[in-house]
Amino acid sequence: MALQVELVPTGEIIRVVHPHRPCKLALGSDGVRVTMESALTARDRVGVQDFVLLENFTSEAAFIENLRRRFRENLIYTYIGPVLVSVNPYRDLQIYSRQHMERYRGVSFYEVPPHLFAVADTVYRALRTERRDQAVMISGESGAGKTEATKRLLQFYAETCPAPERGGAVRDRLLQSNPVLEAFGNAKTLRNDNSSRFGKYMDVQFDFKGAPVGGHILSYLLEKSRVVHQNHGERNFHIFYQLLEGGEEETLRRLGLERNPQSYLYLVKGQCAKVSSINDKSDWKVVRKALTVIDFTEDEVEDLLSIVASVLHLGNIHFAANEESNAQVTTENQLKYLTRLLSVEGSTLREALTHRKIIAKGEELLSPLNLEQAAYARDALAKAVYSRTFTWLVGKINRSLASKDVESPSWRSTTVLGLLDIYGFEVFQHNSFEQFCINYCNEKLQQLFIELTLKSEQEEYEAEGIAWEPVQYFNNKIICDLVEEKFKGIISILDEECLRPGEATDLTFLEKLEDTVKHHPHFLTHKLADQRTRKSLGRGEFRLLHYAGEVTYSVTGFLDKNNDLLFRNLKETMCSSKNPIMSQCFDRSELSDKKRPETVATQFKMSLLQLVEILQSKEPAYVRCIKPNDAKQPGRFDEVLIRHQVKYLGLLENLRVRRAGFAYRRKYEAFLQRYKSLCPETWPTWAGRPQDGVAVLVRHLGYKPEEYKMGRTKIFIRFPKTLFATEDALEVRRQSLATKIQAAWRGFHWRQKFLRVKRSAICIQSWWRGTLGRRKAAKRKWAAQTIRRLIRGFVLRHAPRCPENAFFLDHVRTSFLLNLRRQLPQNVLDTSWPTPPPALREASELLRELCIKNMVWKYCRSISPEWKQQLQQKAVASEIFKGKKDNYPQSVPRLFISTRLGTDEISPRVLQALGSEPIQYAVPVVKYDRKGYKPRSRQLLLTPNAVVIVEDAKVKQRIDYANLTGISVSSLSDSLFVLHVQRADNKQKGDVVLQSDHVIETLTKTALSANRVNSININQGSITFAGGPGRDGTIDFTPGSELLITKAKNGHLAVVAPRLNSR
């Protein structure tokens, strides 16, 4: 068989060697550690993960040895059936990460190793699937890890539960309420560096989706005497040290505080201000951030810290006796700070601290206090201020956690998960009223545990007729009755002493106890003890034999602490406080209430009874915490201490009940309702009795006789694996049913949707057919009318406009315009135009002219300046030569060039001679002499003022435009032209005969430059020119086959030019 290995997030390797024999290997820091729960050798080393699997389950030694083995291997969790036993390791084991949470989420209880997260997930799934309120009860001695377990549970729910619709604010507040309550309610004791000095029960509300949507906290009996007194090696509440160590300098200056705790009387009595395991500075940052998360405003934080600082200043108030031995305040500076921080009148506070107000026969009298009484009043005020502030703080947190959607349907379907973190059983060298109340609370919780697990389970078996061998256990009801019994209990006797007239003292209370309960087996005093016991019992002490062991209590302070007396004038002073928190803590209605308030013990007893009712209304889960040693050292296993805790927690009795009993029981109706889908005969409904239906169901599931029993109203299943197998089958069945339901629903949904679409389609079709029919009829009617009007108009089309032909004429006009719009000319050369009807001829002509003008305007707007100049020159050429000179048509498609000679082709001497005159145009020409007509190469330059004829580097002739009288050219295709100058100009030798290959271009540019457009003469036959003073020359032009220029015999210049017939 192949070996399969699986590595899980905790570092364990699961080797599957047999389908029913899982084998685990865990990798530890000290090498490879094998934990094979099914192998004998591994079990000998790490023990079993469920005490139910112990072979010698009745042996206390075997039980403790199993704890030792697992503790040695850092396996701090072990089951007793569904009960989790946790041993405090006093160090971080790295087993609470997100990976661990995911490993335990949604997994059956016994499919994974024991863990607090397994209990958390089981409780959460029961809350969601069965819709029943749940409670996790965490119990154990002080320092056993109860508070840490509560925090881990909250962390698990915050990380793994779905987020509510309105975000994760509730989850954050649930988590952040812990550091705030710990700061104000926890302190270092001899046994625990973070001991809860109050009891806490938290309800977390979940909506139907399983998301946390709200919460509520109940607090019980804050140990307010710790504010003014601490035993040696203990500290006051954390908040005082955190504020001094972590507060900003400005904050401390405003509060009048200094960082040294030794400066405050209330912080030095335990002589333990600094603790290496506590970082007050970092804890302060956590608390400060948490206050913001739970909706504290900056003003509220400032008011709260003012109250905390006022308690420290109260402790530093000192008194001195005057001549009459009455107390007087001697620390004015502290009083000044108190007055400002508490926002009260200084004189009123001074008087309240040194006097007591007494009302006698309707009159108010002030009685001065001696030094002892003034110190008592000061400490009473400090305790009252702090304890009431703590109560206000819990209320503030509850308002922050309250669900905001109480009217929504999802809120009405919420379920509640309760977390109980109560102070553990305490036995100190000096035990007082607070330890008495705390241990009484633990007795009540132990009694509830017995009721819900041991006693109720055995009674249930008997009531259901299940064969059962009774398990003997110690029922601590006798101790609870000793404390709380009406008229005869310790609390009743204490209240009676506190309320009776006369001089009642702690010793008279002890004497009355001795008289009333002297025969009780769990009560002992010095007077009632034998000679040997009296050595360990003082005269002012009594001893109770609790379920957890013997505890000796000193009666000193019992009456004062139970009365919780605060002088009336101190109450009046605090009621006048302008501090918003103080004004809520001290209500003025207290002053007018004549009824004596209930004592502290009675209030605590009533609140415990209420707590027990709350827990009894929920489905409980148990975490039993064990402290391995008193020194808080990791790895140390104190067998004597652990044996004591195992005994008083009743773990062995719980194990024996679990081994002899059944793991699961449920009423027939509920069981059938949950699992009926697994059997075809019971699904979907069962018509007979529920008991018969369950019998059919378990037979179908294949339960063996030893796996279950049928009671009178319930079915009992012995083994968890049987229930897990049933749950697995149900999960598979649910998937199948869900698929069928989804298919049926989808079919129904889409069928309904199809029918709706079909009805809509029929309606739309009907409406559309009617609309089309009406449109068609209207169209036909309109067409008939239109045809009738057109025919009538056509008949009268030549008549003047009248109602009969107006429609036809308008139609004709419209048709013509629409047709014209489609057939408009595309350019100015396009002369096409649709033939208009007779009535539109005038309008058509106007439109044609507008169209042409528009096209011309668009064309002109689109051309560049260079092209515009080109067109202008071409237009001038056309005006001069079109139809008059044979070679003009050949020049039309050729663009005129700005110049035919570059500046590099013109001599620099010529340019220098011209000076600043720019050359507008230059072209090479041939000049003919005036006498012999000899041709000579020249350059013709046009400037803004003259025509310049250049020979190489010499200006031969300059003709100003003013002296240019005209230009002559023949009508043939030759390229000769004559520039005529004034005869009176002595500077000129006569007219100039020139020849240019670009004669049209040259003459056009010359005419434009000289402004002689109208001075160009196009001659036919001959041109006469001035050849010099008193002498004329003639040029004869005759058509021929080719161009020929010669001097004729008659002395004329004969030019033969071919006719191109292009004109």
From Swiss-Prot:
GO terms for biological process: actin filament organization; actin filament-based movement; cellular response to type II interferon; chromatin remodeling; endocytosis; positive regulation of cell migration; positive regulation of cellular response to insulin stimulus; positive regulation of protein targeting to membrane. The keyword Phosphoprotein applies. Residues 734-757, 758-786 form the IQ domain. The modification N6-methyllysine is found at K383. The modification Phosphoserine is found at S408, S536, S864, S1041. Residues 47-731 form the Myosin motor domain. The modification N6-acetyllysine is found at K486. CDD domains: IQCG, MYSc_Myo1. The keyword Nucleus applies. Transmembrane segments: none annotated. Isoform 2 contains a N-acetylmethionine at position 1. Interacts (via its IQ motifs) with CABP1 and CIB1; the interaction with CABP1 and CIB1 is calcium-dependent. Interacts (via tail domain) with PLEKHB1 (via PH domain); the interaction is not affected by the presence or absence of calcium and CALM. Interacts with POLR1A. Interacts with POLR2A. Component of the B-WICH complex, at least composed of SMARCA5/SNF2H, BAZ1B/WSTF, SF3B1, DEK, MYO1C, ERCC6, MYBBP1A and DDX21. Interacts (via its IQ motifs) with CALM; this precludes interaction with YWHAB. Interacts with YWHAB; this precludes interaction with CALM. Interacts with RPS6. Myosins are actin-based motor molecules with ATPase activity. Unconventional myosins serve in intracellular movements. Their highly divergent tails are presumed to bind to membranous compartments, which would be moved relative to actin filaments. Involved in glucose transporter recycling in response to insulin by regulating movement of intracellular GLUT4-containing vesicles to the plasma membrane. Component of the hair cell's (the sensory cells of the inner ear) adaptation-motor complex. This is Unconventional myosin-Ic.
